Amino acid sequence: RKLKIKLDYHEYDNNESGLFSTNSDALRIIQLAKLKGIKPEEQYNLQQHTQDITETEFRRIYNELNRYKKEFNLIDFTDMITEFIKSDKSPNFDVVFIDEAQDLSRTQWNMAKSIWDKTKDTYIAGDDDQAIFRWAGADVDSFIAQTGRVMKLAQSYRIPQVVHDIAMNIVGRIKNRLPKEWRPKMQKGLLSYHQEFKDINMREGNWLVLARTRFMLEDLEKQLHSQGLYFENKFKTNKEQDLYTAINDWENLRKGVDINYEQISRIASYMSQNNFEKNSLKYLDKDAGYQMSGLKERMWLKTDKVWYEAFDDAPQKKIRYIRRMRENGEKLNSSPRITLSTIHGVKGGEQDNVVLLTDLSR
């Protein structure tokens, strides 16, 4: 049956710690209710959603989704967890380790308990001060309520002193938290504030740029692109990488280095018929090596110009960007110096220089 209600459905997002991601509030309400172990109407009544969805419309979606899953014998990831708990068929282990435990939902805590009830020793690692997934159903209170022997790690080997100071000032405002003291590493570090992202000099060093949401990264991409700085967006494929490789292959070919069929095909993809006879690719031996002189003698290759002139079928915007990066001394054969990510998407990461956008608008 069709309800004629539009749902924006996304798959499980591996870049966001494997969390279920959807822009549909109806689906998010249903998912959060299952993670929290509460009824869907209870989650709806919390009014934590942002879209205008009536209770009647929500119930229709919820009932129809259940009917559809039952009709086609379908389950989702959270259903797997609840079915596992009901089955009481956890294997017996000598030792179980649970990491990042502050991010577990109540349903996941129930699953963990069903496992450790049949385990000799269980080690739970986590930090309630790092709990940033409440919005996704994380039950931090269950982490805080755990009993047993506590081993506190009092020395950080990652956090410099100035970052430690501001972090302690912030966590001190959290009402329900486990009291803890820890020491920063010996380096003082540097903490600076800027009015605009463009004011930050990122021409040297490795950088991690963090924003609240993905759409906030798009404007940063444009700014870094215009400056000719080598960067990557963690949530996008680097579309320039193939072109970088073709450029290196072309420059090697001009220097007299042999290249293979795959390299020639890549180069040809950025040339028009004026510079490369595309039909000739089918005559190339895929196991042989080729030099520029041989390709030109056969009239397959018709140019020996510098890459940005020879690659006449490559997007001009990409060509200008790569030329500017090279002028800036960027090492395009290495990984990008600058990584753009969301705060949630980079949890556990580190870098020499970190930029945090304090605009937390949704």
For the regions a protein language model found, what residue spans apply to each?
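Conserved P-loop NTPase-based nucleic-acid remodeling module centered on helicase motor cores
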Residues: 1-24, 225-228, 232-239
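Accessory N-terminal region flanking or inserted into the helicase ATPase core
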Residues: 6-97, 106-111, 124, 134
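Conserved interdomain hinge at the start of the Helicase C-terminal
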Residues: 190-205
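A general structural motif
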Residues: 92-94, 119, 204-206
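A short acidic-Thr-Gly-centered motif at the start of a beta-strand
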Residues: 86-89, 199-202, 330-334
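Phosphate/oxyanion-binding loops and surfaces in catalytic or ligand/nucleic-acid-binding neighborhoods
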Residues: 2, 6, 33-36, 122, ...
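Core RecA-like ATPase module of SF1/SF2 helicases and allied nucleic-acid translocases
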Residues: 161-164, 214-362
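Conserved helicase motor core of SF1/SF2 NTP-dependent helicases
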Residues: 102-188, 208-226, 232-242, 333-338, ...
